[in-house]
């Protein structure tokens, strides 16, 4: 009886919290300082923690970075900003897309906003409440931002509304990671330099300027201006081998079964066994953020230091893996990505980017920080 209870305890302990995203905050700090080493000492840093810090947990990431030399945090909308405030983040929070209906919340939680069109500028001019703002101009991304031709009108409106305190002016690079588009990137930089020079002439003073993201820092650091925005590089991805991924997604085998030649695995009979096989079932699926295109020998995992391929179609909450050629037991650890399974490699197979694979990880996956 005692032996049975001990075995049960060990098994249940292995099976508890089956799927976990392990996050190494020390690597986060090392990535931060590595990227900072490419900058002038006076260059300020905005940490991008939008989309739940690219799936890593925005409050925990922001609190760690808040201990460092950070100008502020960049989020997508007011809900992300409020979440950080309620989570105890004290520093500057910049909302990239504040929307037209969030004014009272922006004021209540002391959030900065990015103003990128006349509708937003007119709204915050009309409200007459003190607000910290950052202007965004379009230089080729053709997404958010005032056009260069609007510059003089924007400055006139700002000068008529001193309650709007402009802290910086920015734009966004469209393709800073690719050398083949270097001319386009340099043209964006040139346009922005002209915009900022004209802006400073019109206001009769200096303003903080920022254009570079992670890949911009890696490839165009001489154009760093006054401030940079670091996103994916903090989490360990980027065209630089010195950046180390900060996360590792692991689960466990929850069931092992043997199947015969001719048996199928998963929905749609998409995988037919050509021989007798042993398969493991892992409780992670596309609802957790595991891309369904990794089905049927596209995706692979590590079990007991052995490479194993996903077979059958990935389900909403599970996938199956071929363990015929390894020694494995129910409860054994499964590495889905991490030091042994590269997110970059996984993204390339899927014709996507690490950003997507990280940010689509469901929040129901437990995050463990060390």
Where are these regions (language model features)?
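Active-site anion/phosphate-binding pocket segments in diverse small-molecule metabolic enzymes
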Residues: 6, 11, 16-25, 29, ...
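Active-site-proximal beta-alpha core segment in soluble small-molecule metabolic enzymes
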Residues: 19-22, 27-30, 43-211
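Conserved PLP-enzyme active-site core in the AAT-like
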Residues: 38
